[in-house]
């Protein structure tokens, strides 16, 4: 009997020590409820296949039809429907820009997310999947397709915008869609109506959605050294039809008009998500991704909120929708904030300059900040030359910590190959979570202490 009790006690202690030594469960609060998003069309199909989800989805759509959030929250059926859908793929679904059923996907997304917040939000979450491509990918593809001129800044004397138009004409798809929107946007309807803006916008959307960015970016963000080049860049979207109007509407009215259309609303939300100025990042962009910002900017062309260069200055880059803040009344501060997201946006300005210069940011995951009493550990790294010009030259708050000359034949403007980076840390970031895990570190194990081992031995001895 004593031996049996001793064996049970020893087994219990052994299991306790094993549990202490085992890796922690991955289902912590950081990962609870996370699931990989699917596109909203597929999520709708999955929901329709489940009677509980489909019935709750119909209920929620009826609840949101009145657009009265307080009434919806006071209704128990509406609350129950929302709780069920928050656990379904519909709640986290996203869309892809240019996908076959993009409009249907966006309609499903906004049918759930519209009305869930009180009032109108200044910044709305983007319904699109995050962009993972980089500008360096665009440069590499441009070098493959064009053969020469992969770097937009190879020659300071050439008209890069003219070169971009020539490159487009060498591609059948680009040439066809460009000729189409030029013809439509230049077609005068009557002496009082210079063009059909609706058809012009549609043709522009087709061009920027269907032509690879290796061509469209070169036309839209080409670098210029003189006014003639800058004017050609400004004329890329045929602004007399697609952009300008007799009078400038109020910017908040223009935003409200845009938000009545699911596509326009989505493109504006995506622009804010990827281009909103952030002073916590190296590039002033939310995710340090110039490509994401430029893609979001180009995605707004062909809608009521269409932005463009405000003048033909080759030295300053200022873009804006065709609107002003006159007549804003007590909403003037909000209007100015909205407008400055275009006219005084360091993220967007840096992204346009980076493409024009043929450079991209080579980011390694951020290392812990250095102590004031310690110098950074950089071995024999050449100091940056005073004349080095990069995409951050106009950014007041951007300091490049790690810049590198592009591969695939790209060269820096001063023809000196330079690479200065701090030690790279390879990390993985779990989607939907801010938790950073080093892949080589593995799960951390808790070693059983010597005290626990001694205690188990003592208790076993007493039992015997």
From Swiss-Prot:
Pfam families assigned to the protein according to its UniProt record, in alphabetical order: GDNF
Pro-sequence residue ranges: 441-464
Entry membrane topology: Lipid-anchor; GPI-anchor
Coiled coil: none
Lipid anchor positions (GPI-anchor amidated asparagine): 440
Family: Belongs to the GDNFR family.
Protein known as: GDNF family receptor alpha-2
Gene, per the UniProt record: GFRA2
